[in-house]
Amino acid sequence: MDKYIENIKEDLPHSILIIGERGSGKHKLYNKLCELKNFNYTMDITDRITKEFLNSEEIQNPVNIIMLSVDLSKLTVRQQNMLLKLFEEPSKYLYLCLFADSEADVLETIKTRSYNIVIDKYARDALEYLITSNNKNIILEVCNTPGQIEIANHTDMEALYKMCENMVKKMRVANYQNALTISNKINFSDEYDKYDLFLFIKMLSYKLMTEFYETQSKELLYAYLELKELNKRIWLVNNKKQQFERFISRYWKAFR
């Protein structure tokens, strides 16, 4: 992580954008950045992006040196535009650290006004070294970062693989009500005995595209596009289970 901050550790930019896949170490890098300056306090404001908050005295005229962090991948375009308020006449006491899973998640106006750090992709052999479960081949097909590997190590990947395989190969004959029960197997909020939502999306995406390359089936392509849309929308809403069930409904219809 040190290589990413070598050029800025003597003069910390007021806005830093860190881009990297989930589990790539964005927050570890953020913690290192926070050690570079004597901040009075740090605050995650991802869930507080409103005009009222951004115009508040606390933000516009801070009396302490503060670091605000924001996950742009969880913000709508409208919220990102609101965030630009902080770039107009920034206080010398205010610092921003912005996270994004990909460049596509970030408005160009934010990107150009920030110091950009893009975390390199991890080599396959480096990831393989981190795997402690017996499902090495399956994990390496869907996990690209140490954080994803960590979750996979504590997941029954064989069972997840089988569930996603059934969603691809047997959805044509599946009963609608049975299809909806898939949502009961996904962790939407601290239900760690269930499948991680992001890992599920990665696995189903892998299975859909593998099958599509073999069959060129249009229904598989439609189902994959529905999954991509889910991955864009679900991180922006509070009621993730409801959003997921809407996806299952559209996914089921794609095979009809």
Language-model features and meaning:
Residues 1-39, 92-94, 100-256:
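Charged, glycine-rich active-site and insertion segments that engage polyanionic ligands
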Residues 19-22, 44-47, 68-72, 99-101:
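Structural motif
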Residues 61-66, 91-97:
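Loop/turn-to-beta-strand initiation segments
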Residues 39-53, 104-106:
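AAA+/P-loop NTPase substrate/partner-engagement loops
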Residues 6-7, 46-66, 71-74, 78-86:
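Conserved alpha-helical scaffold flanking the Walker A/P-loop in AAA+ ATPase domains
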Residues 84-88, 216-217:
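A generic short-segment signal for beta-strand/edge and adjacent turn/coil regions
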